[in-house]
Structure formats: structure tokens, C-alpha cells
Swiss-Prot record:
Record localization: Nucleus
Phenotype when changing residue 666 to Q: Hypersensitivity to a cross-linking agent
Catalysed reactions, semicolon-separated: Hydrolytically removes 5'-nucleotides successively from the 3'-hydroxy termini of 3'-hydroxy-terminated oligonucleotides
Family listed: Belongs to the FAN1 family.
Molecular function terms, GO-annotated: 5'-3' exonuclease activity; 5'-flap endonuclease activity; flap-structured DNA binding; metal ion binding; phosphodiesterase I activity
Role description: Nuclease required for the repair of DNA interstrand cross-links (ICL). Acts as a 5'-3' exonuclease that anchors at a cut end of DNA and cleaves DNA successively at every third nucleotide, allowing to excise an ICL from one strand through flanking incisions.
One annotated Gene Ontology cellular component of this protein: nucleus
Effect of residue 103 to A: Hypersensitivity to a cross-linking agent
EC class: hydrolase
UniProt binding sites for Mn(2+) 1: 651, 666-667
Protein name stated in the entry: Fanconi-associated nuclease 1 homolog
Superkingdom of this protein's organism: Eukaryota
């Protein structure tokens, strides 16, 4: 199935067998949710509903049309009359023509396709369909291709053949392409015998070499087509509206098709497709535009090195370009948000709808640009931006703890020779830490760093601890450490994964080597990383995950609410989450897990993070060994920031049923260091009185 999907969609999909990915899946139309039908004799009947006998019932076409119909039914106000006519024209196409358009639309954007290389068995006549789609203005043909675009789609063998004909030097694709493009700009024509001469048309006008070369290039590649950009943009916008995308993702439709290739059973929840996420067409266009902008800018803001002065300057220019736009959107959105709040509208729906405003994406870009300001050492600008971000609480409220922490660091490190000014800034840093710890939106993952900084500042300023802050629990975050030695195998693998020799002389990973040691001293365990905790979380919070919250279930095929990876998940369900955490502290987690497991296991219901390969007995055994308060704290971190807290969980999950003991172990080989996410989890586990240790594995010392 994976191979078929890769070939169909031209993407490289890594093998994700095992744990479900933390992403939503939306297949279209019907999905078989019941057990297989049986014949009279009790034999399993043929339940394959996905056999494609023509393009009319193709899963690609049916899924695409389901998206179109849903968006047009719910949100027609975001399209112009011309756009609606285009969509109607698309619906009027022959089924083979619609099918071919959808298949090429799903492939790489702005790519030319050689008609002779398109092989779709379900389509009766691909060549005829391409011609019709060109005539009906859905495709562009090779007449609009540039020389560079033609060269790009030719194979290396074809380029080498052309190079021999035109006496062009070069062996690699880049060398030959460069020489051909250079040659095309010359006015003299080079014929196959290597002789150069000037060429004139019937009217005595001199030809350029480019015209001659284009003919040769087009002779090699034959007919080519690609979907028109204006149509691709329109249908991608419809995709974004349908999937309620908060990131720019051109593969949403392919995810939908992948889900349709399987017979998934989805959880029961109340479907609430909203029609007012985008108030008007202009807002939708602005949102899609800034999503595409973020796709380009986020990698620049994240990856630009401080040593690359030119790239850093370009990144700064991008920041200063978007800053005034962000400021305008932010001020407008704050005013409108509070107007909506005062209208007694459901706050949960207000927060959900505001996450699809251009201001939400611009705020995310500004948050990412803090990295560039730090590398550029623009301390005053960064400090001002942090103040502005903290002055609002409608966008990225889950990042407030990070902003407090960074702001306190800038204030603590303020450089001056004046001791009074220095004390002022350190006092300001102290106040920032206190505000951060007291802020109800500060997540657990930021508490520990704020607490440690607060202690250092109090000591530096010689301030007495007169009033204890809420939730203030200072902890020693140094885990116990175990040192093991083993024999490392040099397997020539270029990856960073180390390979070790087991007791039975097999090649194993460093985690498996550590697990063998723990099992030898009485522990049961698995190398699970986040898998066990995410499975326990899904089963414990099932009813809360699929609670009827306005706007978060917009498709009948979701494995999680749309807001799970956002700040809104915790805010919109705070009361029910806190009630569930109290039940967990009172020892009821096992009963909740057992009830949900028994109810959903037969259908293998598709839920985010849930791995049905674990038995109910094993999960209950693990829960019975973890202290109830520790389990509640672990789940609190996941409810506050599921996306980021899903990473960094220690490698090994270990338990001893007879002694009712549980422990996590993070395994490190030589020169491997703890990441920030791993440090957070270790701090959280220690503060929650859940045993955790770091297991260092190194090679045997040579005698």
C-alpha cells in the first residue's frame, strides 16, 4: 500500500509502522467501520470497497469533489462569481479529464509533465485528455515553457545526446544545462556538423540560437502540460479552507487519499462544520497569502547562522518588513476579540476562529524571528517585541512562558557599569520571573527554568523569600546516573546511530543494550519513548479529546480535534481537564483506561497517539506502578502543549509489578547530550516523584 501511494503521489513517504503519527487524517466519503460481513457459511465476504473500475469512482476524484462540495456548501461567500464559474466548469468536464487534472494537481506544484510519461491505467486516453484540458484552459502546454524548464524535465541521457549534437561540453546535468543555456543566448546558430553561421528568416530577420535550440529540446521532450497556476492556487485555497490548515501544507489531499486506502474506524464525536471561520473573501486571501509567506520565512528565521552576515541581514530585512503589518493586525484583532468576548459568544469558538486570522500567522512569524534578533544582538528591539507579545493573550498564549524566560534573561544580562542601573535591570528580571510563574498561561515546560532563574536572582539581589509563589516547588533536577560498558560494532553506517554487540552476539541498538541490563536485574521494560505515554493519554482522556467543543470537528474522519496541537486545547477544556486530573490523583486512571480500551479495541479505533499493539493488561500494569500524582503531572504537560511535550520523553519505560516500582531511563552513548526537551521531562518527572535516570553507555576500556 505504501509503495502504491508513493508512486501515485510522487512523494517519499517514510515507513511509519507502529505508533500512530501525531497528525490528523481526513479521508473522504465512506469508511468501513464495522466488522467484515460474513456469508451464509460463515466465510468472510469480499469487503474491498475501493476497487476502481473507472475514473468515475476513483478515490482521488471522489475525495477531491467531496472537498469542493463541502467548501462550496458551507462557505460560498469567500469565492467570486468567476471562481464559482471555474469550479462549475471543472465539474462539467468528462470524468477522465477531471481525474487527470486531480492527479497532476496532487503532484509537485508548478511542475511540467511529459504527456508521453503519464501512465494512469484508469484513464482511457491520457493524450486526448491532455489536449482537451489545454483547449478548455485547465492545462498549459509546452509552447509556454522556458528553455530552463524544458532542460529540467529531460533525462541526463537525453541531455548528453543533445550535447553531442550541439558540440556542448560537460558530463553532469548541471554542467550540460549551464552550457546549453549559455549557448541559447548567442545569435549564431550551431548546426550538427559543428559549423557556426548566422541564420535569417524569410524576411531577413536574424534568428537567435534559442529558437533553434528550443526546437531541438522540444523534439526530445515532446508534448508537455501542467495545471494552470491560477487554478492550482484556487484549488489549494479550497484545500486550506476544507482542512482548516494552520500551516501551509500542499500534501493535505494526499493524506486524505492515504487514509482512504485503509478501512479506518474513527471515534464518535459531534460534527460541527463552521461557516464563519473566514468572515469574508479578503480575510481568506490574506490568511492563505501569509501561510505561504510563513512557509518561506520560518526556515530562514530558524536556520540562519549568526556567522552568515549576508543571510542574517536578509532575514532582518524580512523581519522589519512584516513587523508593521503584524502590529496593525494585532491591534485590530485585540479590539475585535474583546468585542466578541463582550457579546457573550462562546469563548471557545472565538479562540478557534481567531486562529485562522492573518494576525495569528504573523504572530507566529514574529515569534520565530526572535531567533534572528538574538543572533543580531538587537537586544532593545527583541526586548520591545517580547513586551508586545506578552501584552496580548489571544495568540500563542502557550509560548508566554518562553517569552517571560527570554525577557528575564535579557534583563539579567543587561550590560552597564552603573551599579544602580544594573540593580534596576536585575530587579526587573526578578519581577518578570515572578509574573511568568504566576501567569495562568505559563505551561509546565517553562516553570522549571523560570524557578531556577528566580532563585539565582533572589540570591544575587539578596531578596528574602517573603511570599511564596503559587505552584512554586523548587526541585533538584539532577537525575541519577548509570554507567554501562559494551562492545561497539563499527558497521560503516553514515547515520549517527551506534550499533552494539548483545550477549548473544547479535547487533543491537544502544537502547536495546541498556534494556538487556535492566531486564537482568528484575525490570520489565520496552523501548517506547513517547509511545506508551501517548497511548495512556489517549485512553485516559478519550472523552475529553472528543468532547463537543465548537469548531474542532469539521470532518467525519478525524483522529483528534483540530486544536489539539494549539494553545486552545487546554484553554477550551480547562475545567474538564482539571476534573480528570483529580480523578487520576485519586487512583481512577486504571478504570478509565480499561473501560475505553474494552469499548474501542475491537474496532481498533484510529486515535492520535494510540498504539493498539499494547495489551490492556500491560498498560494497566504500568499505570499501577506509576504514582498517581506523577501520572497526573505527566498528563497535564501533554494537555497544555501536546505537540512539543510529545518529544523528549525518556527512551525506556521500566516497571516491576511485584515491587510496584516504575522508572524511566534516558539512554546516551558516547558524546550524546541531553536536549532541552529531554531536560524538561527529567525535571518534570523528578518533581513529580517519578523515578528517572540517565544511562550512559560507553565502549569497554582497552587494557
Amino acid at each position: 500500500m505504501k509503495r502504491f501511494f508513493n508512486e501515485a503521489c510522487d512523494i517519499n513517504t517514510p515507513d511509519k509502522s507502529g505508533v500512530n503519527e501525531n497528525k490528523l487524517c481526513f479521508p473522504p466519503l465512506k469508511v468501513v467501520c464495522q466488522a467484515p460481513e460474513t456469508t451464509v457459511k460463515g466465510q468472510v465476504a469480499n469487503t474491498n470497497k475501493h476497487n476502481v473500475y473507472s475514473t468515475k469512482n476513483s478515490m482521488y476524484l471522489l475525495g477531491f469533489e467531496e472537498i469542493l462540495n463541502t467548501v462550496l456548501d458551507c462557505e460560498p461567500h469567500i469565492f467570486t462569481d468567476d471562481e464559482l464559474r471555474v469550479i462549475e466548469n471543472f465539474k462539467a468536464l468528462d470524468s477522465d479529464e477531471r481525474y487527470l487534472f486531480v492527479r497532476l494537481f496532487m503532484r509537485k506544484r508548478n511542475k511540467w509533465f511529459r504527456v508521453g510519461h503519464l501512465t494512469y491505467p484508469d484513464c482511457k486516453d491520457v493524450i486526448a485528455c491532455c489536449k482537451q484540458l489545454v483547449l478548455k484552459n485547465f492545462f498549459e502546454d509546452e509552447s509556454l515553457m522556458s528553455t530552463e524548464e524544458i532542460i529540467e524535465i529531460l533525462s541526463l541521457d537525453e541531455l548528453r545526446s543533445l550535447a553531442r549534437q550541439t558540440k556542448v561540453c560537460g558530463k553532469s546535468r548541471s554542467e550540460i544545462s549551464k552550457e546549453i543555456i549559455f549557448l541559447s543566448k548567442r545569435q549564431s546558430v550551431l548546426h550538427c556538423n559543428g559549423q557556426q553561421f548566422l541564420s535569417f528568416d524569410a524576411f531577413g530577420v536574424m534568428h537567435k540560437q534559442e529558437s533553434f535550440l528550443r526546437k531541438q529540446l522540444l523534439y526530445q521532450c515532446k508534448s508537455c502540460v501542467k495545471p494552470k497556476k491560477i487554478l492550482v492556487d484556487l484549488f489549494h485555497r479550497i484545500n486550506i479552507v476544507y482542512f482548516r490548515s494552520s500551516i501551509y501544507d500542499e500534501q493535505s489531499l494526499t493524506s486524505l487519499i492515504l487514509a482512504r486506502l485503509n478501512k479506518f474506524s474513527y471515534p464518535n464525536y459531534v460534527l460541527s462544520r463552521t461557516s464563519n471561520v473566514f468572515n469574508c473573501r479578503a480575510q481568506c486571501l490574506e490568511y492563505v497569502e501569509v501561510l505561504e509567506l510563513s512557509k518561506n520565512l520560518v526556515p530562514i528565521f530558524e536556520n540562519t547562522a549568526a556567522s552568515d552576515k549576508e543571510a542574517l541581514e536578509q532575514a532582518l530585512n524580512s523581519f522589519f518588513e512584516i513587523y508593521p503589518i503584524w502590529s496593525t493586525y494585532l491591534n485590530e484583532d485585540i479590539r475585535e476579540f474583546w468585542v466578541e468576548e463582550n457579546r457573550k459568544v462562546d469563548t471557545r469558538l472565538v479562540r478557534f476562529s481567531f486562529s485562522f486570522r492573518p494576525g495569528a500567522v504573523y504572530t507566529y512569524l514574529i515569534h520565530k524571528s526572535l531567533n534572528i534578533l538574538a543572533k543580531s544582538r538587537l537586544v532593545e528591539v527583541e526586548h520591545e517585541i517580547l513586551d508586545t507579545l506578552l501584552s496580548q493573550n489571544i495568540y500563542l498564549v502557550g509560548k508566554r512562558g518562553h517569552w517571560y524566560n527570554r525577557k528575564a534573561l535579557l534583563e539579567y544580562n543587561f550590560k552597564t557599569e552603573d551599579t544602580n542601573v544594573l540593580r534596576y535591570w536585575k530587579t526587573l528580571a526578578l519581577s518578570t520571573c515572578e509574573n511568568g510563574i504566576e501567569d495562568k498561561y505559563t505551561h509546565l515546560r517553562y516553570y522549571f527554568s523560570l524557578q531556577r532563574r528566580l532563585v539565582r536572582l533572589r540570591k544575587c539581589l539578596k531578596v528574602s523569600n517573603t511570599t511564596e509563589l503559587k505552584s512554586m516547588k523548587l526541585i533538584n533536577n539532577n537525575p541519577s546516573r548509570l554507567f554501562l560498558h559494551g562492545e561497539r560494532i563499527h558497521n560503516g553506517d553514515l547515520s549517527n546511530r551506534t550499533v552494539w554487540r548483545s550477549k548473544t552476539n547479535n547487533a543491537i541498538t544502544v537502547e536495546e543494550l541498556a534494556l538487556q541490563h535492566y531486564q537482568s536485574i528484575g525490570w520489565e521494560g520496552i523501548h517506547a519513548e513517547s509511545s506508551i505515554l501517548l497511548t495512556l493519554f489517549a485512553l485516559t482522556f478519550w472523552d475529553i479529546l472528543f468532547e463537543d467543543v465548537p469548531g474542532v470537528f469539521q470532518s467525519p474522519f478525524q483522529s483528534a480535534p483540530l486544536d489539539l496541537h494549539t494553545d486552545s486545547f487546554y484553554i477550551s477544556r480547562e475545567s474538564t481537564i482539571m476534573k480528570r486530573l483529580e480523578e487520576i490523583r485519586n487512583g481512577k486512571a486504571g478504570l478509565i483506561i480499561k473501560d475505553n480500551y474494552i469499548r474501542e479495541h475491537q474496532r481498533k479505533t484510529f486515535c492520535v497517539g494510540l498504539n493498539w499493539s499494547y495489551t490492556c493488561e500491560m498498560l494497566l500494569e504500568i499505570v499501577d506502578c506509576i504514582n498517581d500524582n506523577g501520572l497526573a503531572q505527566i498528563f497535564l504537560a501533554l494537555t497544555q502543549d501536546y505537540k512539543n511535550s510529545s518529544s523528549g520523553i525518556p527512551d525506556l519505560c521500566l516497571w516491576n509489578p511485584s515491587k510496584k516500582k516504575f522508572m524511566f531511563s534516558e539512554v546516551k552513548s558516547d558524546n550524546d547530550r541531553l536536549s532541552e526537551a529531554q531536560k524538561f521531562w527529567i525535571s518534570l518527572l523528578i518533581s513529580s516523584e517519578v523515578d528517572v535516570e540517565v544511562c550512559h553507555v560507553s565502549m569497554h576500556k582497552k587494557k
